[in-house]
């Protein structure tokens, strides 16, 4: 896979936090930032404005990540990864980020925002 620049990784992590907060099942393995980045890499072009439409590969990654984010600790870790990387990225379109789960058929029961407190993610 091509090496992702920090802007691309941050955009992927922003999207990851959104997806990870919605799963409710328990899992035994911890989710890693590497897994998040890998699943969401196809979404980077869309959420940074380099693509006008969301790709099937992006939605596949979002749905796959939703399946991996089964425990509260996994979702909290992903949220923290997102915040540590995404705060330095200014070109992310949060309107597009917040719309990705819905466009991919994944339901998020709360507003998507960079102000999300990762400690409150369940």
UniProtKB/Swiss-Prot annotation:
GO terms for molecular function: lipid binding. GO terms for biological process: lipid transport; response to ethylene; response to hydrogen peroxide; response to salicylic acid; response to wounding. Expressed in phloem. Also detected in the epidermis near the vascular tissues in resistant plants infected by Hessian fly larvae. Keywords: Disulfide bond, Lipid-binding, Signal, Transport. Disulfide bonds join 33-81, 43-58, 59-104, 79-118. The keyword Disulfide bond applies. Belongs to the plant LTP family. Plant non-specific lipid-transfer proteins transfer phospholipids as well as galactolipids across membranes. May play a role in wax or cutin deposition in the cell walls of expanding epidermal cells and certain secretory tissues. This is Probable non-specific lipid-transfer protein 3. It comes from Triticum aestivum (Wheat). The gene is LTP3.
């Amino acid at each position: 896979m091509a090496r992702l620049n920090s802007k691309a990784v941050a955009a992927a992590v922003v999207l990851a936090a959104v997806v990870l907060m919605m799963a409710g099942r328990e899992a035994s393995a911890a989710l890693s930032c590497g897994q998040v980045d890998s699943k969401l890499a196809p979404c980077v072009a869309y959420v940074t404005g380099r693509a006008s439409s969301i790709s099937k590969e992006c939605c596949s990654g979002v749905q796959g990540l939703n399946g991996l984010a089964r425990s509260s600790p996994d979702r909290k870790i992903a949220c923290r990864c997102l915040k540590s990387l995404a705060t330095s990225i200014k070109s992310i379109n949060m309107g597009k980020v917040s719309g990705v789960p819905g466009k991919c058929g994944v339901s998020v029961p709360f507003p998507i925002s960079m102000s999300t407190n990762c400690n409150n993610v369940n």
